């Protein structure tokens, strides 16, 4: 979205995130069935000449070295859906919770610190911290590590669960409906 707007190719970009985790949950696995939720969210990003309203920067990253932390072993192209895949619950999401927690806190904290340092921002410059809504403990630990107050941090995971790609636009909407953001 940022690239389309900055290049002048588009004035408005609609960003949508949607997930239906209920279709890949093993409801006997307490490590995942209470965490994930279904949801969809969207945001319109528009061009502006006001620097205070502009997207400052974007950071996207992934690391395949941690593929075993959260995954589905079957139901895709490597192990297509079959009676065996379904019987063995290979199409259900599996997660190594403690390892995922540690990596998420470390990575998100570091990414935010790098972005703030890059743009010479302090905690006081950040009015709202709206992270991916993975887990309340992760959000709380990252917020504390970064020095953000509870008032700065938007949390919706306790309401909707981890809706993955939908979590940030849903959290933005929640904050908007509360009058916290414009």
Question: What do these predicted regions represent?
Answer:
Residues 1-66, 171-182:
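Conserved beta-strand-centric core segments of catalytic alpha/beta enzyme folds
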Residues 75-127, 138-146, 171, 175, ...:
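Conserved active-site "lid/cap" helical segment
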Residues 29-102, 106, 110:
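Condensing-enzyme catalytic core mediating Claisen C-C bond formation in acyl metabolism
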Residues 6-11, 19-21, 35, 88-98, ...:
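Generic detector of short, locally flexible boundary/turn motifs and exposed helical patches
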Residues 16, 36-40, 75, 133, ...:
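Short glycine-rich loop/turn motifs that provide flexible caps or phosphate-binding loops at active sites
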Residues 13-18, 100-103, 159-162:
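N-terminal start-of-chain detector that recognizes signal peptides
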Residues 1-9, 105, 109, 127-182:
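Claisen-condensing/thiolase-fold acyl-transfer catalytic domains that form or cleave C-C bonds
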């Amino acid at each position: 979205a940022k690239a389309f707007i900055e290049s002048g190719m588009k004035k408005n970009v609609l960003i949508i995130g949607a997930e239906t985790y209920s279709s890949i949950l093993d409801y006997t696995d307490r490590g995942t069935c209470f965490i994930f939720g279904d949801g969809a969210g969207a945001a319109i990003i528009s061009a502006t000449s006001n620097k205070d309203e502009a997207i400052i920067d974007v950071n996207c990253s992934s690391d395949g070295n941690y593929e075993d932390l959260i995954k589905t072993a079957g139901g895709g192209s490597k192990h297509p859906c079959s009676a065996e895949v379904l019987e063995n619950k290979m199409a259900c999401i599996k997660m190594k919770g403690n390892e995922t927690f540690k990596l998420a806190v470390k990575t998100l904290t570091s990414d935010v610190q790098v972005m703030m340092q890059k743009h010479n921002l302090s905690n006081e410059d950040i009015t709202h911290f709206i992270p991916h809504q993975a887990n309340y403990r992760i959000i709380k630990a990252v917020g504390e590590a970064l020095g953000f107050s509870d008032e700065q941090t938007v949390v919706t995971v306790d309401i909707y669960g981890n809706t993955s790609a939908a979590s940030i636009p849903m959290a933005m909407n929640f904050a908007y409906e509360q009058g916290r953001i414009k």
